Amino acid sequence: MAMKKLLIASLLFSSATVYGAEGFVVKDIHFEGLQRVAVGAALLSMPVRTGDTVNDEDISNTIRALFATGNFEDVRVLRDGNTLLVQVKERPTIASITFSGNKSVKDDMLKQNLEASGVRVGESLDRTTLSDIEKGLEDFYYSVGKYSASVKAVVTPLPRNRVDLKLVFQEGVSAKIQQINIVGNHAFSTEELISHFQLRDEVPWWNVVGDRKYQKQKLAGDLETLRSYYLDRGYARFNIDSTQVSLTPDKKGIYITVNITEGDQYKLSGVQVSGNLAGHSAEIEKLTKIEPGELYNGTKVTKMEDDIKKLLGRYGYAYPRVQSQPEINDADKTVKLRVNVDAGNRFYVRKIRFEGNDTSKDSVLRREMRQMEGAWLGSDLVDQGKERLNRLGFFETVDTDTQRVPGSPDQVDVVYKVKERNTGSFNFGIGYGTESGVSFQAGVQQDNWLGTGYSVGINGTKNDYQTYSELSVTNPYFTVDGVSLGGRIFYNDFEADDADLSDYTNKSYGTDVTLGFPINEYNTLRAGLGYVHNKLSNMQPQIAMDRYLESMGDPDASDFAADDFTFNYGWTYNKLDRGYFPTDGSRVNLTGKVTIPGSDNEYYKVSLDTATYVPIDNDHKWVVLGRTRWGYGDGLGGKEMPFYENFYAGGSSTVRGFQSNTIGPKAVYKNGAHTSWDDNDDYEDCTQESGCKSDDAVGGNAMAVASLEFITPTPFISEKYANSVRTSFFWDMGTVWDTNWDPSSAPSDVPDYSDPGNIRMSAGIALQWMSPLGPLVFSYAQPFKKYDGDKAEQFQFNIGKTW
């Protein structure tokens, strides 16, 4: 047997041993230990080839090259005559990766981090990388206050040089802040300063923002808040000298000490602006005006810089630089602010592009643009385009990106990146109440028909008391100037008695056409004509109905028909930040109609809806919503408004917790009426001379509804779905009344239905979800102020309608 000479041993387990420094010519190369790695691949990674003359340095380079491939745990190179014998031990292949005990970090996030480090199924296992991963994960837990956390990588060998990799987590508990001390504060108390922190050593039950669990990132944010607090009050020399975070021996408690130097208060002595102002010095000077003796304020300085950038952005200077340098005079405690402005190049827009609009046509988005291609860039015009796209309601998110054109010093492309949502909805509603039982409704609505922007709806209701169908179409851009054209046709067969309303049947059909005229960015006027035919039958006489029939000259009619032509009008002010689930802004909608000559009836009717969203945090996750709805109508020329045109309240869109349309005046049937006027739902004759009181709603010619809603982040919902789900707590109130009601015409036990003070109230919780079927709305409300005859419906569920 030929004697083998050891040239260099493993870099991991023994030192390099050199024999034959003179070198030799390699006639052959053999490998031992290769399993997964092919011989050819191993040879290609080596700097030595057959026929080369090699020495100790070449052998060292060979070993390093083989280790560098990441495929081997051990490499030895031996000489057998003129043959190189390469002995290797391959790293095992990862067959599977699992996790155990991780609650704070999701599996998907862990897999992404492992893949970024080269640890994935099918790859070789590098044990040194595992150590780094263990340490990195433990450091993450330490940063969020879990100092007792540990992460261990468990490697289980499998046949054919494979392993199972399992990361075992012991997260422990978050260390809670025992005390926060601020040392060096004299102008403000420690309690006052800490009240602005997210981290707290004491958190009252009502504080949903404060947190006793220590997090390094939150502490950094709180320190910045502390700095801003002082700088905004004139303390220009304020400094955070040091911060100590101490851990209790059991690693469950944290003590934080912040050492500060307040310094003195300084006043602004003036602002000096210099640099390239691009000819807008007068406008910039207005933005930098200060009141004499005003305290230095860091936030105002930052806002001033942003305002200057926005001003220049409106004129096409897309990338201006604005830097403020305070010159502090310690002698007289003043600060002179020197503002250097560099407007940079002026840009014009080469192209406007859209990304993410797989359904919506480019033309639908482009017509909402206020920034034009080939024109100077205007940041305000770009933002207006974003607002208008958001208000369409077609998209979950809209983002803008201004991109430089390569090779051009004065051109940019504006890119609108949208994420489309499902604009079609299958409208299905179900409600359940202690008295009402189960009720249903259905319909289909598509607000972006085939991506054209057309709104098309087919709605229908079929139940025990109603057969209703409607087809509606709206073209929002009937003309290139944005004049809209909408129309609808409908048919309705309504058995009011079965709906717990006053006893009559109405078969109606009609149509209307409406034009919308945009006045400016936020205001639209509407005008149109309508026709409706109403055929009433089976009318059991009740006081409100009799008043109407008497005004029409047919007081004893049990059947009645009317054909009416109406002039329809409206006005909409819309400054909401987006079309669905708004978080900021207001919307006002006024609608009305009045009969025109040729109509059997003579009346007018008007309603006003308002909604205002006020965010109370910068991220718009906590929002206060106020809604109102007002309605009023009356007859003209001595006639009354038809009773079937009355306003109603109650239900998911007005006062939740009450059955739909049941709030307000109830029918008082006249002597001889044959109806189910009592609570037993048994038909019988009314025999009381003064009339019979009932629980059948008749509505009124006046209505007022208001709602106060507090929108909160939805618990247990990931950030991915945060824009699709909304949770809120609400307080609803509303009333319906009849301004023409005469209390003397009814029995003494009947309430005064002309009194608007009979307000109903409820409170509850609502959940809205933009599901694949369309908007899903769940609400549970408890009426806490109601009157005799009101019908509760605590749980309500609806698909296809949000507010």
UniProtKB/Swiss-Prot annotation:
Biological process terms in GO annotation: Gram-negative-bacterium-type cell outer membrane assembly; protein insertion into membrane
Keyword Secreted: no
PROSITE patterns: POTRA
Segment forming the signal sequence: 1-20
Gene3D superfamilies listed in its UniProt record: membrane protein fhac, membrane protein fhac: a member of the omp85/tpsb transporter family
Superkingdom per UniProt: Bacteria
Principal location: membrane
Classification via Pfam families: Omp85, POTRA
Keyword annotations of the record: Cell outer membrane, Membrane, Repeat, Signal, Transmembrane, Transmembrane beta strand
InterPro entries on file: Bac_surfAg_D15, BamA/TamA_POTRA, D15-like, OM_assembly_BamA, POTRA
UniProt family annotation: Belongs to the BamA family.
Xref: HAMAP family: OM_assembly_BamA
Quaternary assembly: Part of the Bam complex, which is composed of the outer membrane protein BamA, and four lipoproteins BamB, BamC, BamD and BamE.
Protein task: Part of the outer membrane protein assembly complex, which is involved in assembly and insertion of beta-barrel proteins into the outer membrane. Constitutes, with BamD, the core component of the assembly machinery.
Protein name: Outer membrane protein assembly factor BamA
Organism: Salmonella paratyphi A (strain AKU_12601)
Lineage: Bacteria, Pseudomonadati, Pseudomonadota, Gammaproteobacteria, Enterobacterales
